[in-house]
């Protein structure tokens, strides 16, 4: 089926240490009823070709939830953040475009892949486009071209792991989205997860009254 943009793979970034989650794997947590893995898969499976998880653990659990999921680890041991996951992805994916998404997002905009491709096309030099929700830049929620690999490698070699600075070198474009009543666009700790669930429960009670 012609989607109006080039073949694009999806990589879910789940390679962090989860220190603020007491070691819990965020991709296997339920923010909205389903596990994050299932939620992300269901939302984006029709928009992408292959789906990968960048993670160092729980492969068998991922595959029990989504049997055709593919997995890979960072090229280097240790925890170097999303930049290393993005760099490592290009050794595995076959597509020349990859949508990266953090494992802890709460909101996945409709038509996000198409809109990121549209943003990317606005500048011929651009090798990246990222999502902004309600004015907040979500740099790990982004679309990269394969040509970005050289810059990713250079930044890692220099131990310059900031996505924001790297994206400046990639002439990154932005796809802007708005979402009312979005209190957390991502969950970074157990405290935030508890707050998110409490707010969600309150909204559900309020909406039924």
Curated annotation (Swiss-Prot):
GTP binds at residues 13-15, 26, 54, 74, 104. It catalyses: Mo-molybdopterin + GTP + H(+) = Mo-molybdopterin guanine dinucleotide + diphosphate. Coiled coil: none annotated. It is found in: Cytoplasm. CDD domains: MobA (cd02503). One of its GO terms (molecular function) is GTP binding. Keywords: Cytoplasm, GTP-binding, Magnesium, Metal-binding, Molybdenum cofactor biosynthesis, Nucleotide-binding, Transferase. Mg(2+) binds at residue 104. It comes from the Bacteria. GO terms for biological process: bis(molybdopterin guanine dinucleotide)molybdenum biosynthetic process. GO terms for cellular component: cytoplasm. Its EC number is 2.7.7.77. Its cofactor is Mg(2+). Belongs to the MobA family. Transfers a GMP moiety from GTP to Mo-molybdopterin (Mo-MPT) cofactor (Moco or molybdenum cofactor) to form Mo-molybdopterin guanine dinucleotide (Mo-MGD) cofactor. PANTHER family: MOLYBDENUM COFACTOR GUANYLYLTRANSFERASE. Monomer. This is Molybdenum cofactor guanylyltransferase. The gene is mobA.
């Amino acid at each position: 089926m012609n989607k109006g943009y080039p073949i694009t793979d999806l990589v879910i970034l789940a390679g962090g240490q989860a220190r603020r989650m007491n070691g819990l794997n965020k991709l296997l947590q339920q923010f909205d009823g389903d596990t994050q893995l299932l939620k992300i898969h269901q939302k984006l499976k029709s928009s992408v070709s292959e789906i990968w998880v960048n993670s160092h653990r729980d492969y068998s659990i991922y595959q029990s939830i989504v049997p055709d999921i593919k997995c890979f680890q960072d090229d280097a041991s240790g925890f170097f953040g999303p930049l290393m996951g993005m760099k490592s992805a290009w050794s595995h994916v076959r597509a020349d475009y990859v949508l990266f998404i953090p494992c802890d997002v709460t909101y996945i905009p409709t038509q996000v892949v198409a809109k990121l491709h549209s943003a990317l096309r606005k500048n011929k030099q651009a090798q990246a486009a990222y999502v902004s929700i309600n004015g907040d830049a979500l740099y790990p929620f982004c679309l990269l071209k394969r040509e970005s690999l050289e810059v990713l490698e250079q930044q890692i070699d220099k131990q310059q792991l900031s996505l924001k600075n790297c994206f400046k070198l990639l002439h990154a474009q932005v796809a802007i989205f708005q979402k009312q009543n979005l209190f957390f666009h991502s969950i970074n700790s157990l405290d935030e997860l508890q707050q998110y669930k409490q707010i969600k429960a309150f909204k559900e009670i309020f909406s039924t009254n």
